[in-house]
Amino acid sequence: KMILMPELAEIGLSDIQYNATNGFVTARLPRNSEKEFPTIGFIAHMDTADFEAANVNPLIWEHYAGNDLILDAEAQVMLSPKDFPALKNYIGQTLITTDGKTLLGADDKAGIAEIITALEAIKAADDIEHGDIKVAFGPDEEIGRGADLFDVAGFGCDFAYTMDGGPLGELEYESFNAAQAIVTIRGKNVHPGTAKDTMV
């Protein structure tokens, strides 16, 4: 919140709020037209996966040529199109990777950056009429609880989209719902070869 809220104010958003109950930062780009437009929301998460994420050292690869990317020569860490064929889709583009020692955290810093950049572009383009556009940046997506406390009614959008990675131009319009379960089975720890009628 300490970084996002001032940045949202700097680009001219209003109603910037931090909800201490659910950890979400929300804001609104006010409508610039008297026409009737739906209120659209864009959502991204602030948390990253629970792995090494301190002291991130991004590597920038300009004009990627389709070759192996050596992230850490000493530890023999690399990204290769042999293992990651999708790299070939980005030949000629600039790639940003980790140095192989930590997470990059692009999931979902990239989504936040996309939303803020899009809002800047929309705000700067006087010829794009729009209704209210709302944003929400929240925690706990990586542990599957990000939406548990999200105030959908309070967000007040007709439609909302989550920005969370994927190839340029791809739109996912449905997804699965995942949950975690802990199953405890009480019984005898017996080798499967002799377990018939005795294990449970």
Which residues are covered by each model-predicted region?
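Acidic/His- and Gly-rich active-site-bordering loop/insert found
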Residues: 1-94
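Conserved active-site and cofactor/substrate-binding residues in soluble primary-metabolism enzymes
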Residues: 3, 20, 37, 110-113, ...
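Broad gene-expression machinery/nucleic-acid interaction feature
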Residues: 24, 39-41, 132, 158-160, ...
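Short beta-strand segments
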Residues: 41-45, 136-138, 161-164, 184-186
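Short glycine-enriched loops at secondary-structure junctions
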Residues: 46-48, 83-84, 166-168, 176-179
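Acidic/histidine-rich catalytic neighborhood of metal-dependent amide-processing enzymes
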Residues: 88-176
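Acidic-enriched catalytic cores of C-N bond-cleaving enzymes acting on peptides and small amides
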Residues: 173, 195-200
